[in-house]
Curated annotation (Swiss-Prot):
Source species taxonomy: Eukaryota, Fungi, Dikarya, Ascomycota, Saccharomycotina
Region Disordered, residue ranges: 114-140
Gene that encodes the chain: EAF3
Disulfide bonds: none
Listed name of the protein: Chromatin modification-related protein EAF3
Compartments where found: Nucleus
Similarity comment: family membership: Belongs to the MRG family.
This protein's UniProt keywords: Chromatin regulator, DNA damage, DNA repair, Nucleus, Transcription, Transcription regulation
Length: 316
């Protein structure tokens, strides 16, 4: 996305926007151009940013107030440049591919234990029985498409993402943060598992570098594309508490990490990485997803009910 002072999209533009790990069609209602002191609506009228509910994090960037097609107005929200995409054939195809990763999980029956509901209002998923390892079939690629990658995710993990979406958007729960097993712990556990397999020092250096890159991706993208609207108030509260010391990888856990892997192919497509580096990243991504599948019961987090005040503010 462009960093120019002029806004990339204008009011009333048809766009695509990330909401959580998926992409939805949306319409731009209002815009805020980088470093400007006003917000512009579809009629060209200006409103001071102080009265436009523009989050302070968007004061210094191009930002867009969008309405998701077919959604109620309560879901309208401000999004930054990293969450908005031009409505074109390539991006619509990316939207479909992301959606298919979740809808395929719904086609197959879930084998799940009854979710346990604690007296405190917490809710935790039961895990499906692990399936045998599946060989990923390579898709035919179009040579004209740049950095097209596919990261295989087992049905067990897709079930987690489907439940995750339902708990947050349907039941209006949030994940209990901080996680007892945050992303940084998961990545370190994976590194230790590779060391225990007597992996060579040279290979370990490569794996360690990739894990550092994944953690950096996670920290940079969490607030931009990995949160549902209902979770943003929780994030803002954490930001107030931790300030510049906030590192999402030390607070958020496996559910948000899985959302990153769903979005990762799209992120890779926007980089200038060479094909060798991409192949190494994809291979390690598949390996760590396999590791997460085998250890999911250790990493799952509780969902908790929110207060009426939180519910009201988060939906406003």
């Amino acid at each position: 996305m462009s960093g120019d002072d002029a806004a990339v999209f204008k009011p009333n533009a048809r766009v695509l926007a990330y909401h959580g790990p998926l992409i939805y069609e949306a319409k731009v209602i209002k815009i805020h151009e980088k470093n400007k002191t006003f917000i512009e609506d579809g009629e060209g009228k200006h409103q001071p940013i102080e009265g436009g509910n523009l989050p302070e994090e968007y004061y210094s960037v191009n930002a867009y107030f969008v309405h998701y097609k077919g959604w109620k107005a309560k879901w309208d929200e401000w999004v930054g440049p990293d969450r908005i995409l031009e409505y074109n054939e390539a991006n619509v195809q990316a939207q479909k591919e992301l959606k298919e990763q979740l809808t395929k999980a719904k086609i197959k029956p879930k084998v799940k234990a009854e979710p346990a509901v604690a007296s405190t209002g917490t809710k935790k998923r039961g895990m499906p029985v692990s399936s045998a390892s599946t060989v990923t079939k390579k898709k035919k690629t179009d040579p004209n498409r740049v950095n097209e990658v596919s990261i295989f995710m087992k049905p067990e993990l897709k079930y987690i993402l489907v439940d995750d979406w339902e708990f947050i958007t349907k039941e209006r729960k949030i994940i209990n943060i901080p996680s007892s097993r945050p992303v940084t712990v998961i990545l370190n556990d994976y590194l230790q598992s590779k060391k225990d397999q007597d992996t060579s020092h040279q290979t370990m250096d490569v794996i360690n570098e990739i894990m550092q890159g994944l953690e950096l991706y996670f920290n940079k993208s969490l607030s931009l594309i990995l949160l549902y609207k209902f979770e943003r108030l929780q994030y803002m509260n954490l930001l107030k508490e931790h300030g510049d010391d906030l590192r999402p990888s030390e607070l958020y856990g496996v559910e948000h990490l899985l959302r990153l892997f769903v979005a990762l192919p799209g992120l890779i497509a926007q980089t200038t990485m060479d094909s060798v580096s991409i192949n190494v990243l994809v291979k390690q991504s598949k390996d760590i997803l396999e590791f997460i599948t085998d250890n999911m019961s250790v990493y799952l987090n509780d969902y908790v009910n929110v207060s009426p005040a939180y519910d009201s503010l988060a939906r406003s």
